[in-house]
Amino acid sequence: MVRSKHIAKGGIKIKTINTATIIEEVARLCQEANFNLGRDVMEAFKKAYEEEVSLTGKGILQDLIENAKIAEEEKIPMCQDTGFAVVFLELGQDVRIEGGDLYEAINEGVRRGYTEGYLRKSIVGHPLERKNTGDNTPAVIHTKIVPGENLKIILAPKGGGSENMSALKMLKPADGVEGVKKFVIETVKNAGPNPCPPIIVGVGIGGTFEKCAMLAKEALLRELGEKSKYPDIAKLEEELFEEINKLGIGPQGLGGKTTALAVHVEIYGAHIASLPVAVNINCHAARHKEVVL
């Protein structure tokens, strides 16, 4: 349930959102993200198919297109790894949550979505004891407070294979843009076939250790191929895209010119002594769906 009211005449408009609605929407997003690949990714597959010179690579890209179509039509996961539920919340400062704890509601939505959608349960409760929680919780939840009276929920299931190939390095400021490029390209090269290419490469530059990693993760949420608003960063994205595709890793690591579908770079201010760089790799199943309440 979602309802709005003014707290006083001419005052701030407060929207109340019940956790029952949040649970329902998160459960839906879990399934939708795993069943329906974004149109931007499908178009990138088709473009890559037309440009790929390797017959093996073309065959794999055709299979990926067909696989995505079957998943959508039959409402089954496009990949057996249905991912860690990574949730991004943009919580309007004029929103009131009622009916329980917001984070508990998110986790209950994930629990229901993965259970009712027969999605693989991939999460262990303790990283060393390795006992599966059996319901794909806990989710990873990132919250940003923003102006307004809406709650935006973005759900991005993240597979283990591509996440394992991600990396972060604290460069020296003197390393500059060439140092950044070298690290990104080396990370992709070392990953080879493991993240199930063609990949999407999210890069974070600046901030602190944890902010840099977050930037790289957020870069993966951008519509595929959408350029940075900063001309120098857009140029860097283009250069990295070209260099990565020269590596010849190709679709599923079997050779070809399509190693990456896109490179997205996000930046933030940095300390005078630091140049943090993070690379978060996404497999070809670039899944994320959103809703605004």
PLM regions: where:
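N-terminal amphipathic/basic-hydrophobic helices that include classical n-h-c signal peptides
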Residues: 1-13
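Non-transmembrane, aqueous-exposed alpha-helical and coiled segments at domain scale
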Residues: 10-293
